[in-house]
Design a protein with these regions (language model features):
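Activation on beta-sandwich/Ig-like modules and their edge loops
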Residues: 1-93, 98-132
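Conserved beta-structured recognition patch
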Residues: 83-190
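Enriched but not universal
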Residues: 187-201
């Protein structure tokens, strides 16, 4: 499957984030969201922060290319549930995974904090979990105040691999070191995932 990826995160008032489905999401699919940091030493999430589940309760599959918006109160424009927590305004993580908190299978990740490879994890720093790769299903913005970013271009007609690469490349994101990047400045997105051209034999 192609997974789901964050295309817009706003860590300043009002806290919001959007994801795009990169493959169809069957009805009753459950995806967990957390702003916990990942501890590379214990291969587990650090304590504190919030962990909550979103479920596709629409009665049908959500099509690839669909954008879903979540707010800090646990609301979603499709399905039910979400993070139900305010996102930090500096150095925040957001992970999407399936499975359990103690045995997660990661779908996508995002941080506006510090990525570390040694030392102790904090609320504003994280290891990158196995299964997540920068430029494929993880994006690290660096340590930015207010933690706001969005995919700059509005219209996308790309293969799945190209879509994943584009979304997770910081060169294709607009980031904010102030609280002025707001919902009103977000593009109206169109994500059309096209089939790869067949290889000529």
């Amino acid at each position: 499957g192609g997974g789901r990826s964050a295309i817009r995160v706003q860590g300043a008032t009002t806290d919001l984030y959007r994801i795009v489905a990169l493959n169809n999401i069957p009805n009753n699919t459950r995806i967990w969201f957390t702003d916990k940091s990942w501890d590379g030493g214990t291969l587990s999430f650090v304590s504190g922060e919030v962990n909550n589940v979103w479920t596709n309760t629409t009665g049908s599959a959500i099509a690839a290319g669909t954008v879903i918006q979540f707010d800090a109160l646990g609301g979603a424009t499709l399905g039910t549930g979400g993070l139900n927590s305010g996102l930090g305004s500096a150095g925040e993580q957001l992970f999407a995974y399936q499975g359990t908190l103690t045995s997660p299978t990661f779908v996508a990740g995002y941080t506006s904090g510090t990525v570390i490879t040694t030392g102790v994890t904090t609320s504003t720093s994280t290891y990158v979990p196995a299964g997540l790769t920068s430029g494929t299903n993880f994006v690290a913005l660096g340590d930015i105040t207010f933690g706001s970013s969005y995919v700059t271009a509005a219209i996308h007609n790309r293969s799945l691999a190209d879509m994943r690469s584009h979304i997770h490349n910081t060169a294709n994101l607009t980031t904010g070191n102030t609280s002025t990047i707001t919902n009103g400045s977000w593009p109206t997105y169109t994500f059309n995932i096209i089939s790869d051209e067949p290889t000529t034999q």
